[in-house]
Amino acid sequence: TFVESAGSQAPRNLSGNGHDMSYGYGGSVGFQWSPDDEVTLAAAYTTKMSMSEFGDYEDLFAQAGDFDMPSTWTIGIAVRPSDKLTVMFDVQRIEYSDADSVANPIENLYNCPVFNPAGSLEYCMGGNKGPGFGWEDMNVYKLGASWKASDTWTWRAGYSVTDQPIADSQMTFNILAPGVMEEHLTFGFTQKMKDGNEVNLSLMYAPENTVRGPQNFDPTQDVILKMQQVELEISYSWKR
């Protein structure tokens, strides 16, 4: 890599290398407790997923292509005011700071000798302190409801809202992954057939959201990240 060669070798694993593969390991633990028939409490923790490096992109992501998955904390409650209705509320914490390739700010690159002769190679692309997406830790709040209208129909709806993980000072690198969504709305149903088979439908809509900020290498230009999402899933399950 550029860093491993002490800057004498041009970066060869930066872009245009097609697909790459990574594998990793992690763990999860959780508990669920129902003090009575109407209330269920739950909590879960998922460790950071330690992933193998993307060798074909070791000059792009920090730590020679390392791209770990962040740890998460989740707590939730489900309340059943009747036999037909269940209301659920979750709070989830995503620790993007666990993963340097995700959390490192793009300003780290300014300490690379290419930009700062007195700097260190570890701040260059692919270095141990190389630039990343600059994503911040975030909290996600989720509210959902499930209504069993009959023995054959169950309806569901949900809403989630979160902090914006991308600061307007981190625009250029995030062109690769413009994850600017803050809200998601979901709707769906399950229809149980006479033979016990089921038809499931779910619809997710994320309203358009925009983040705007200066281009990190030319502040006279603005970068606009905009995204809107729609997802439809239909499935059919049967019992033998």
Please provide the spans of the model-predicted regions.
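Outer-membrane beta-barrel porins/channels
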Residues: 1-240
